Amino acid sequence: MNNKIVKVGNIEVANDKPFTLFGGMNVLESRDMAMRVCEQYVEVTNKLGVPYVFKASFDKANRSSIHSYRGPGMEEGLKIFQELKDTFGVNIITDVHEIYQCKPVAEVVDIIQLPAFLARQTDLVEAMARTGAVINVKKPQFLSPGQMGNIVEKIAECGNENVILCDRGTNFGYDNLVVDMLGFNIMKKVSKGCPVIFDVTHSLQCRDPFGAASGGRRDQVTELARSGMAIGLAGLFLEAHPDPNSAKCDGPSALPLSKLEAFVSQMKAIDDLVKSFEEIDTSN
């Protein structure tokens, strides 16, 4: 199988290239917090030689509760993103939820993300594709890995081949997620070699069936991330926070920012080792 290369600035994202870290925070909480988090990621990834893309949302439009924090909104969020780019020279990924957001967001950031809950909304998919931007497609929790090929086809029909696929866990009964490690290579195959990345943070969500916010299992983030990196992936999607217990969204799944260097160092070691192996064809 040929692995496609998707270029994000000067980064080549591909399943057989050194992994790219798509890291940041769940949602923009403030300009100062974004600067602090991005600076730490840049410092760590530069030190370790890991390609890096900053991630955060300007609007968490799918929060469970009407009272939950959503973010600063598109206009303010894009200003913060532009300042991060100007200050740190980073590439940026963020999600869109509405058709009208696609064009202005794609003019500022480098990758626009199709949220898992919206991945089958054809009009939104087409609007994103027509921007020509790189698109990161989150696999819906309710969709099999094999069905991701249909979403890639929709984007390709609009003339856009710049697609990354991302697994963020699959429903396991009510209010729980598991990660099917066999699904990563299925997504590679049905997409004809698109880069596949692993959102380890959101895969750790575990909901209170009667609560308004997601719980999480950040104490298991390292073991789950190690498992995913052993597959041989194009990238890892990670959220970290200086104080996860006070984070405005998904703190229970976020890596403490103080642990970032040790964590990324381990992921790089696994990626380097796995990609040094000769591929063994066991199909015959």
Curated annotation (Swiss-Prot):
Name this protein carries in UniProt: 2-dehydro-3-deoxyphosphooctonate aldolase
GO annotations of cellular component type: cytoplasm
Substrates-to-products reaction catalysed: D-arabinose 5-phosphate + phosphoenolpyruvate + H2O = 3-deoxy-alpha-D-manno-2-octulosonate-8-phosphate + phosphate
Stored NCBIfam families: KDO8P_synth, PRK05198.1, PRK12457.1
Intracellular or extracellular location(s): Cytoplasm
Gene3D superfamilies xrefs: Aldolase class I (3.20.20.70)
EC number assigned by the record: 2.5.1.55
Keyword Magnesium found: no
UniProt main location, coarse: cytoplasm
PANTHER family registered for this protein in UniProt: PHOSPHO-2-DEHYDRO-3-DEOXYHEPTONATE ALDOLASE (PTHR21057)
